[in-house]
Amino acid sequence: MEIIIHQAILHVLDTTMDAPVLSGGGMEMTAEKTAYFQYHIEKLLASDDIRQCRPLPDSAFKNELEHNHDFVDLSCRIAGVLFDYMHAHTTIPVADLAVVDFTRDGEPWLGILKLNYKNGYTHYTETVEGAPVNSIIQQRACLPSQSGKVEEGALVNLTDYSMKLLEKKFDIDGHKDFYLSTVVFQYTTAQPEKKKLQAIQEAAVQAVQENYADQPHVEAQVAMLIANQAADNDNQVSIQQVRQQLEEEYPLAAVPFDDYVEKSDVLEAPEQPVTVTPARIRRMESRSIHTANGIEVKIPTELLNSENEVEFLHSDDGSISLLIKNVIL
């Protein structure tokens, strides 16, 4: 994946003031600033808390994207809408808004990063009786660090206006609700990627367990199946791919899997692939086994059914012992 930053602009949305401080032009893009935005965009793209959203028919935001090709003016309009809503609902964290024009693998994208303020500390020096005295002072408007996390943001694919959205619920007029998707952007609110992945896994596990009752470690085997597909397909997996794999390895589970997917209220658009983050793929590639006294053993998922490597011994009292073979000390 190649991310190229073309331009970026920053607006100050401090709701302790009556109006936003809107920038009249884009910032000069140094290597440090480019690296900062690249990092946070890549981190958003890899997050499984992201929501895949589509514009509603009357989305003013999408209409603005289609007809306003002035980057600075477009960013100011987005900042204005966001500030007005934040100013009316002060439970929403104050922030700076970075709007970033970038390409991802050659396609045009627009990044909208709400950089919520963090408290931080720095040194300051004052003169006391003619001598310098160093101390620390709290800064209440620190932006997320380069290794930190952007808590709210949207990445818009300008070829079809689809959106990858990271949003949080805040107390709005007495109840917790989203505001970016519903008010600022007027986009659909889809389920996060990790919930979609969980729904696919659960459907596959149920289908296999019902038709292959004697098959051990079904959850681990399904996780490995999905992890392998994601690793081979640019961190994405589709329901159709999972079904094809089930049809090859567990043919009796394919049709029940279809039924579970159809009944799911999480998988609203089964034809769309689900993003699986590299961190989640790594977790799916092994299983942690814990004993009652706190010992933890991590076993690669692909070895769980290999009796040449590990063996699970079932005792009459219902307990299970783990025999690990070919140990090298």
What positions do the PLM features span?
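Long, hydrophobic alpha/beta structural blocks
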Residues: 2-280
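C-terminal structured domains
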Residues: 244-329
